[in-house]
Amino acid sequence: MASQPLEEPAESQASDELECKICYNRYNLKQRKPKVLECCHRVCAKCLYKIIDFGDSPQGVIVCPFCRFETCLPDDEVSSLPDDNNILVNLTCGGKGKKCLPENPTELLLTPKRLASLVSPSHTSSNCLVITIMEVQRESSPSLSSTPVVEFYRPASFDSVTTVSHNWTVWNCTSLLFQTSIRVLVWLLGLLYFSSLPLGIYLLVSKKVTLGVVFVSLVPSSLVILMVYGFCQCVCHEFLDCMALPS
């Protein structure tokens, strides 16, 4: 008994939403279809035709009678404006505020007209649309539901990338070790070369004549070899230049 007074205002509010706020006639599925303007106000198609006939609006544009917002008419036809699908569903169900469930409640087709009709006309802007998506429980066999199945996918390209990365690391380490060894050897040879003269003199004083002569003659012999190499290189260049000249 206590719920009856609460249900009556709800029913009256639902019936008010089913009426055009200009002519106060009830919407229907024929001449008075609820059309949604870009400002989200609802007007029946018959009133929109009257507004166009009065010439109050520019060509191809409808001025909202409530907020004076201009709505462009696609193809200059009122029928091209989106319908308020919520009102149409309510009219299809009898206009008593009952909810009609579609045949497939898990699917919802979203189109620009559908989204425009889903926006409540009481809001001044339509920047936000909240869509609640609920997970549907699907029937499955007991054996599959009791045993969790986890599948891991490992692409073959990942193994090849790992192998290439490992080989590249080994190659870098080997190259670095080789370069370090070459540098150490060059430094040792340079130290031995520049210290060969005092070392040879020391060996001669120590009466180690053979080694002393070898170390003492290392620097002069290397200088002589470099001079001979440079002289031979100059002679070869001159000879090649003479051969290249046309006869």
Swiss-Prot record:
Main location: membrane
Keyword Nucleus annotated: no
CDD domains cross-referenced by the UniProt entry: RING-HC_RNF182 (cd16555)
Membrane topology according to the record: Multi-pass membrane protein
Distribution of this protein across tissues and organs: Expressed in the cortex, hippocampus, cerebellum and spinal cord, but not in the heart, liver, kidney or skeletal muscle.
An MF annotation (GO) of this entry: ubiquitin-protein transferase activity
Chain segments annotated as transmembrane: 184-204, 211-231
Assembly notes: Interacts with ATP6V0C.
Its biological purpose: E3 ubiquitin-protein ligase that mediates the ubiquitination of ATP6V0C and targets it to degradation via the ubiquitin-proteasome pathway. Also plays a role in the inhibition of TLR-triggered innate immune response by mediating 'Lys'-48-linked ubiquitination and subsequent degradation of NF-kappa-B component RELA.
Protein name as it appears in the record: E3 ubiquitin-protein ligase RNF182
Gene that encodes the chain: Rnf182
